[in-house]
């Protein structure tokens, strides 16, 4: 193992640790709240499932990183790599859709519009979110099924290519494989569009609300304005981190076609880990309950609480 491999594993390990700590913290706080009250709000449920999916995703990415360093042959071919790709694809799409559902929930709860369609969705927000979560599960299964079909076509192509019988049938299968491979990236489009729609609706709603506050000579730092800003920050950060993640995913996926194959894959893996690890802290800071518990925990760790006293996280 060379210096580059060592640095790569250290960076991946650090990102993995931060991601597990943050997402684990989210799961712990929401799980503790549910254990005490036997109830969980819709937003807490979505955040908890988002954290769980990201913990699994981080474990998959870390496993993939170890394969790049210690077992390149297994990483580039074989059933193990296909299994990792299948679990990565399913968990990845599920995580993205959970983040999208969270943005839609914030939009429906915080934004204010008089359009009948928006009001219909707002009044039935719980039912809408349940159907969105079910749709997210189905679309994640669909993207995984598309990947499995891609693997089957790839196996057929390898078999035909091995016989060195490049016929019209081979060309058709190859074109079909390339088409499915390109269309596979379109599974990312729906959550991206929905997130953008939620973001712009919140922006328009905040603009209207701010103008009303100015007309009424009211402070612009009222609770509604702050709620708008928090939701916008969470959705916007998800959008930019998602674009970074998608770019990294393409680099990691198409690394075989780049000059420095292994280095390209390493860069892609490091960038890929940044999204599930980094966005968890933005979610924590954007949620009042999680932020309060996190601050109390930091105070306790820093020794700001008196010895023997208990903060909210321990009560």
Curated annotation (Swiss-Prot):
The membrane topology of this protein is: Multi-pass membrane protein
Q: Which UniProt keywords apply?
A: G-protein coupled receptor, Glycoprotein, Membrane, Receptor, Sensory transduction, Taste, Transducer, Transmembrane, Transmembrane helix
Point out the glycosylated residues in this chain.
165
Q: Which InterPro entries match?
A: GPCR_Rhodpsn_7TM, TAS2R
The set of disulfide-linked cysteines is: none
Gene Ontology CC, one term: plasma membrane
Any idea where this protein resides? Membrane
Stretches in topological domain Extracellular: 1-5, 63-93, 149-185, 255-265
Where on the tree of life does the source sit, at the highest rank? Eukaryota
Provide the GO MF annotations for this entry. Answer: bitter taste receptor activity; G protein-coupled receptor activity
Summarizing the function annotation, the protein's role is: Gustducin-coupled receptor implicated in the perception of bitter compounds in the oral cavity and the gastrointestinal tract. Signals through PLCB2 and the calcium-regulated cation channel TRPM5.
Q: What else is known?
A: Several bitter taste receptors are expressed in a single taste receptor cell.
Q: What is this protein called?
A: Taste receptor type 2 member 3
Species = Papio hamadryas (Hamadryas baboon)
Q: What is the lineage of its organism?
A: Eukaryota, Metazoa, Chordata, Craniata, Vertebrata
């Amino acid at each position: 193992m060379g210096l580059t491999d060592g640095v790569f594993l250290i960076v991946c390990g650090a990102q993995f640790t931060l991601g597990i700590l943050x997402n684990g913290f989210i799961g712990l706080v929401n799980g503790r709240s549910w254990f005490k009250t036997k109830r969980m709000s819709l937003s807490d449920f979505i955040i908890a499932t988002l954290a769980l999916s990201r913990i699994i995703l981080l474990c998959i990415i870390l496993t993939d990183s170890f394969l790049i360093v210690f077992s390149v042959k297994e990483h580039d071919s074989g059933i193990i790599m296909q299994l990792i790709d299948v679990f990565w694809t399913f968990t990845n799409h599920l995580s993205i859709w959970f983040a999208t559902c969270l943005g839609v929930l914030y939009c429906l709860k915080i934004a204010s519009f008089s359009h009948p369609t928006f009001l219909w969705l707002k009044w039935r927000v719980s039912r809408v979110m349940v159907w969105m979560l079910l749709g997210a599960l189905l679309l994640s299964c669909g993207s995984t099924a598309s990947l499995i079909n891609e693997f089957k076509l790839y196996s057929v192509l390898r078999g035909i290519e091995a016989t060195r019988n490049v016929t019209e049938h081979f060309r058709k299968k190859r074109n079909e494989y390339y088409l499915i491979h390109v269309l596979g990236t379109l599974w990312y489009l729906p959550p991206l569009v929905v997130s953008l729609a939620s973001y712009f609706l919140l922006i328009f709603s905040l603009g209207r609300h701010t103008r009303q506050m100015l007309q009424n000579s009211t402070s612009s730092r009222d609770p509604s304005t702050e709620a708008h800003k928090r939701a916008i920050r969470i959705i916007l950060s998800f959008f930019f981190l998602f674009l970074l993640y998608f770019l990294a995913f393409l680099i990691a996926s198409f690394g075989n076609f780049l000059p420095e194959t292994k280095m390209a894959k390493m860069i892609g893996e490091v960038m890929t880990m940044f999204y599930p690890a980094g966005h968890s802290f933005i979610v924590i800071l954007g949620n009042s309950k999680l932020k309060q518990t996190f601050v109390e925990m930091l105070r306790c760790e820093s020794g700001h609480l008196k010895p023997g006293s208990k903060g909210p996280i321990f009560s």
